[in-house]
Amino acid sequence: MNFNFNKYPILSFANSVENLRLLSVEQLPQLCFELREYLLDVVSISKGHFASGLGVVEITVALHYVYNTPFDNLLWDTGHQAYPHKILTGRGEKINSIRKKNGLHSFPCREESEYDSLSVGHSSTSISAGLGMSIAAEKEGRNRKTICIIGDGAMTAGMAFEAINHAGEIQSNLLVILNDNQMSISRNVGALNKHLKILRSVQNTQKNRKKIRLLNKKLFFKDKRIQNHSISFNSIFSNLGCKYLGPFDGHNIFSIINTLKKIKNKKGTYLLHLVTKKGKGYLPAELNPIKWHTISSRDSSVSKSLSYSDVFGTWLCEIAAFDKKLIAITPAMCEGSGMVKFSRLFPNQYFDVAIAEQHAVTFAAGLAISGYKPVVSIYSTFFQRAYDQLIHDIALQKLSVLFAVDRAGIVGNDGQTHQGVFDLAYLRCIPGIVIMTPSNENECRQMLYTGYMHNKGPSVVRYPKGYGVGALLMPMNRIPIGKSLIKRRGKKIAILNFGILLHNAYCAAEKLDATLVDMRFVKPLDKSMILKLSSQNKFFITLEEGVISGGAGSAVNEFIMVNKIFLPVLNIGLPDTFIPQGTQEEIRHVYKLDSEGIYKQIFYWLRQ
């Protein structure tokens, strides 16, 4: 999509940071207006992360105007807000390809541009990486600046505070910009959110500084290093050793530039608190930033099936209605996980712990020890952030906690940072854990119930993003642990399917006249079924939507080797690589996990 010069005259000129710096300060408000309009035009067509970028237009322009990027490092935490950054760094005409196959990455990516100092996608990493870059620059004697832009939602994660704690001690030359829009994807929660609210209230007093100082000289003091007399006081960040500045209006381009220029060459760790509006410039997004966080593609026909997240949310409400011991936990993913209705109906049984996966898991451990029945809803890609807690605090103590692992397998457009393809490999080695892989919505429902009723340790139900196949939801019944189902009987070939590729596998099995088994459980495996099938077939095929290395197929391989079962096995899944962006259908086609691809992989393997 090319810039329309008549509509975007200044943006057309400022299509690189070199040209941006040729503009006068007086031209920057118009640039911000055009940049925001361009975002509205492009993202509404191309789809993608919408509201976050609208909120940081002025911050983005100011940073590239004042700092010498790409020599100076800009680190965008999480990356939802980086679309304006991409546009100003030479990628504006490709922005309509974002999140598409072979298009621009959803988030900053070092392989994509020298202006992307850090590849991101998960939250709360910027300050740690930025501190490392700052130390490296000091050791090299290079006057390179490092600036981290982090949202108040991402600031709730423990890793961000670990980095602030370190930075405040060593006083490296680092600027942290806190983009405070009171949101992550959902509305922010927790004591930090309340603290920032108190800090934001200072904005309303800055017009009356003299009066306030007379009333309470101890509350505020004049920072002589900043000529505009910004207010500094006892914030949590100053207590951790940062030079805290703000809060300031994050949409006042002149104020931001003046402040950045004055602290640009100062020594030590600064935290600049800027208050912004998520969705700024587009009223529907300002009023409902949760809905407009991302614009998703819409199919021409509305699916009549439930999404797996909806299945989970409905199941959760049904259980909570008769079991007051159920406690549902989410790390800041209420909407995406299908928990909105539950949070409203059962507020006393619901905890949003913010972006704190480690805390979420050990919090669940404490509840389980105390006789409650925790259900932790977590995305597959974020579950890996709490791996030690799962092992040390849950599995080692044999605590009965159910993990509803959403977005498992191929997720799609958010790309390599968000694909949920590693969970089976990193979960399978944990002693005593039960891992279930539903093949449709009803199986998901029954497995959730089975895992909830399991009282001998942790259990996991991993299910995909998106809609199911339209399976009828049946009354809840426990599934026998470790038992599979034969879905089709054939000859010579046995396909052992784990999870949602069952329908695709069935099409391939029909062509090959193969036996098809819905294995259901990755751990414990249905060993009796494998032994039985090994005596009736000449070839085994395992199928999963996850990495082959260490996954469900590897579990089958290990079992047949230990039991001296000598027959060829083909493991079908995802290769040893990071899976790029694209639609789920496109990615399955590329990696031959659609029905035709599965058939061809088996067919050509048999011919070898």
UniProtKB/Swiss-Prot annotation:
Family affiliation: Belongs to the transketolase family. DXPS subfamily.
Swiss-Prot/TrEMBL GO biological process terms: 1-deoxy-D-xylulose 5-phosphate biosynthetic process; isopentenyl diphosphate biosynthetic process, methylerythritol 4-phosphate pathway; terpenoid biosynthetic process; thiamine biosynthetic process
Protein's recorded name: 1-deoxy-D-xylulose-5-phosphate synthase
Assembly mode: Homodimer.
PANTHER family, per the entry: 1-D-DEOXYXYLULOSE 5-PHOSPHATE SYNTHASE-RELATED, 1-DEOXY-D-XYLULOSE-5-PHOSPHATE SYNTHASE, CHLOROPLASTIC
Gene: dxs
HAMAP family per record: DXP_synth
Cofactor(s) named in the record: Mg(2+); thiamine diphosphate
GO molecular function (one): thiamine pyrophosphate binding
Binding site for thiamine diphosphate: H80, G121, H122, S123, G153, A154, N181, Y282, E357
Classification via PROSITE patterns: TRANSKETOLASE_2
UniProt-annotated binding residues for Mg(2+): D152, N181
Keyword Zinc-finger: no
Catalytic EC class: transferase
Any single Gene Ontology cellular-component annotation: cytosol
Pfam family, one: Transket_pyr
EC number: 2.2.1.7
Function: Catalyzes the acyloin condensation reaction between C atoms 2 and 3 of pyruvate and glyceraldehyde 3-phosphate to yield 1-deoxy-D-xylulose-5-phosphate (DXP).
Catalyses which reaction(s): D-glyceraldehyde 3-phosphate + pyruvate + H(+) = 1-deoxy-D-xylulose 5-phosphate + CO2
Naturally occurring in which organism (per UniProt): Buchnera aphidicola subsp. Acyrthosiphon pisum (strain Tuc7)
Note on how the cofactor is bound: Binds 1 Mg(2+) ion per subunit. Binds 1 thiamine pyrophosphate per subunit.
Keywords of this entry: Isoprene biosynthesis, Magnesium, Metal-binding, Thiamine biosynthesis, Thiamine pyrophosphate, Transferase
Pathway the protein takes part in: Metabolic intermediate biosynthesis; 1-deoxy-D-xylulose 5-phosphate biosynthesis; 1-deoxy-D-xylulose 5-phosphate from D-glyceraldehyde 3-phosphate and pyruvate: step 1/1
